[in-house]
Amino acid sequence: MLTRQSRLLRRIPPPNAVLQSGLQRRHRSTDRYSNNIHTSSTQNAPAPVYDAPIREKGMTIEAKERVRAHARKIQSSASTAAASPAVRPQPAQHFQAAPQPMPANTPRFESDGQVKNGLDYSFIGLSGGQIFQEMMLRHDVKQVFGYPGGAILPVFDAIYNSPHFDFVLPRHEQGAGHMAEGYARVSGKPGVVLVTSGPGATNVITPMQDALSDGVPMVVFCGQVATNLIGSDAFQEADVVGISRSCTKWNVMVKDIAELPRRINEAFKIATTGRPGPVLVDLPKDVTAAILRTPIPAKSAQPGHSPYLPSNPLNPSSQPSDPLPGDADLITEAAQMINKAKRPIIFAGNGVLSSPEGPKLLKELSDKGRIPVTTTLQGLGAFDERDEKSLHMIGMHGSAYANFAMQEADVLIALGVRFDDRVTGKVDTFAPAAKAAAAEGRGGIIHFEIQPKNINKIVEAQIPVLGDVVASLAELVPQIEAVDRSAWIGRCKATKERYPFTYTPSQEGQKLKPQEVVQELDRQAEALGKEKFIISTGVGQHQMWACQYYRWTEPRSWVSSGGLGTMGFGLPSAIGAKVAAPEKYVIDIDGDASFSMTAMELATASQYDIGVKVLLFNNEFQGMVEQWQDLFYENRYSHTRMTNPDFVKLSESMGTKGLRCTKLEDLPRMMKEFLEYDGKRPIVLECLVSSEHVYPMIPAGKALHEQLLHPLLRNGSE
């Protein structure tokens, strides 16, 4: 009877089979075994004996030695030991190749006269990087924000010393994204970002989500490893198409150089069509380094002419056309409801700012119908707040009088808004008078919106008008009748006087109040001309005080992160805004916590002579979080206190002028110096401010009329 060990040995395959299967499994040549494998045939090798019974432990070792000895005698032919095919194909021709010298001023390649039979021959002989530059020219791109890296070098080499557009190099890719947002919000043109693969691309995820939340057009081009390396966990490889799918309107990887012009056209069209937003184009290195050898369809190389672009439900034609208004019958029905209303209110959002005509039509609607206007945070500037019909911003930290008026209105005219939770408060209790009027057939909610998914998503509208908001307004305004609503306007005016924005002024020897700083800026900006000013902010209490105490009068003068609430947004977005409007005062009102997240971008502003002005509130706290901890967490300040650097010295170390204001009596003089400083150089004015709460405030889960008022107003609350 065989022992257990001998039975196991019977199951071992012949040694030559073991060796050959091992070689196949590893895809290796026989070089590593050349010291102990012969090159002659193995056919006559004697078969090993496995059947000898093993009764002692020592014999186990002896049996193993016999197997090893037999393995050393195995002979192998060259054909048997040949290496298996490589796991990957050879890299593309241009991958890892030394870049070819590019002329200092790459010429523009005109397609006129090079289109035959519907094919464009103008790109033949150009690299993917050169095609990228040409497409930027065709889309009239004047500014690019980005950061180089290995996978995107063919593109950076193609735009080397390009005279056709300017490039701003930030200190972090997130900064590039926010700069592109600021540029887009002020100019109305899509912001363009160019970064490398891996971390370069993932660092732009936050700006893309921010742009998606606030409807900002942005086109992000990122490098990628060569196509033959995709999926191999190569250096700086990341599935950025998968990662960015939920934070972009559309994304794509370009897999062949011939499709590059078409994909770029699609990106710009989708970013700017309908509700604007971010798109991403992933560019593998071998695609941007390759040379185009064949003509491409002419239409695919022309901006706005992409025959493969999915149809826009509002514009089925692939050709450019004017924005389409909503259904004419619904617009007429909306006009009839407005004309019959006794207490209508206009609720204007960012959609009104999508066209220069939007604010003009909004004013005409308000004046003609004698209708008060309130705005969202992103709608600031759409309506002149000096107008007596202005109710300023609505919502969690909006004006008390706007919140009260919203609850009393019998007709709500919502223009380009999403009904965000910061605006509605508890949805079930939002606009109760309008809902009651709808039930009685004498009023209700009218919602003008371009994005279908926003219709009836949060608040049910009695008249939903799907289409371009500004185009719909152009159809609506002529149908509005002049109605005497002096009683309603008078009630709104009385409420404004009863519940103004309020704070307790600072006393001698005390720190500045942040509200005082914003009011001084507003006073001096009014004297210089509000049309010359653009204000950006970070996220936090300072953002709300800027909304409340600066009087907004001009479209596209407000740049802030609303939907996502991105701390660190203020400074880089101000840089982008200043690039878009170099002739204007661009001021970043920021808090110490928010500013610290992207403070290194001061070095960018200094390097490129971008004259942004940072008005910095320093209270050494994460103020908004501290306020919630005060009100709802029994003053337990869990990790909200800041230890800050010397911001003046920090600014000076980056080539930026720094000022510090500690007393109210010095504020007017220092604000004047701050505003009059060289418009081509950045400056920081740090104001040491006290910790304050932002009022009014609507607690989570409460209705608009259940807002917390400033202590000075609470005795008179309704």
UniProtKB/Swiss-Prot annotation:
Thiamine diphosphate binds at E173. Pfam families: TPP_enzyme_C, TPP_enzyme_M, TPP_enzyme_N. PROSITE patterns: TPP_ENZYMES. Its main location: mitochondrion. The keyword Membrane does not apply. Binds 1 Mg(2+) ion per subunit. Binds 1 thiamine pyrophosphate per subunit. FAD binds at residues 275, 397-418, 449-468. Pathway: Amino-acid biosynthesis; L-isoleucine biosynthesis; L-isoleucine from 2-oxobutanoate: step 1/4; Amino-acid biosynthesis; L-valine biosynthesis; L-valine from pyruvate: step 1/4. Residues 1-50, 72-101, 296-327 are annotated as: Disordered. Residues 32-45 have a biased composition (Polar residues). Residues 541-621 are annotated as: Thiamine pyrophosphate binding. GO terms for biological process: isoleucine biosynthetic process; L-valine biosynthetic process. It catalyses: 2 pyruvate + H(+) = (2S)-2-acetolactate + CO2. One of its GO terms (cellular component) is mitochondrion. Mg(2+) binds at D592, N619. The keyword Transmembrane does not apply. This is Acetolactate synthase, mitochondrial. It comes from Cryptococcus neoformans var. neoformans serotype D (strain JEC21 / ATCC MYA-565) (Filobasidiella neoformans). The gene is ILV2.
